């Protein structure tokens, strides 16, 4: 009933503002989001653009400025955090839908229920505990994106510099390939990854560790103490590799924590 009233009220407002032309304006408003979001985004948004997060689907951000379709241009962000009212995730991204939501909040006409994972960082070093586990599970997609950027990226770059011509050809664009969710790997990509891992032992180590960390997150339905035990075992294994990029990533894991709930 509420949505029907909204649609009817919008028609009346358009008729008041634009006269008979308001019917055309209203019709465009009614089909704009369903047509572009459901029709265009679910097609183009799975084949063209870039990915911030390795969600287990082929979703992509078509363009960093979400201006025309309520921010749905940031489709990969939306698929990764489907309950979030805010679709922009990077400093260079803009979500027009979030802009209007914040404006309505400022005017006291709306309130935000969710805008993504509720996680904070504390740079003071401390041992891993269950609070870290909850925070890491909550923000696991961003954690894995960080692993790709700060571990896989630098190591692949260093190995590329040391490689011969054939090795460089194989390692070109390897950083993105080595971060892709296994569900999305076709036969050709799997073969290329196998060749990379056979050629370079160091890259094989960080790739295997990435897969093992993904397995830790898959235990999120288990008791938190079990997940903590698995995470500590992964950390111990990663530290044993004595790789600087890995060490820095491992140290960052204990900085994630869940904020205290707002009791006001």
State where each predicted segment sits.
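C-terminal non-catalytic accessory extensions
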Residues: 196-264
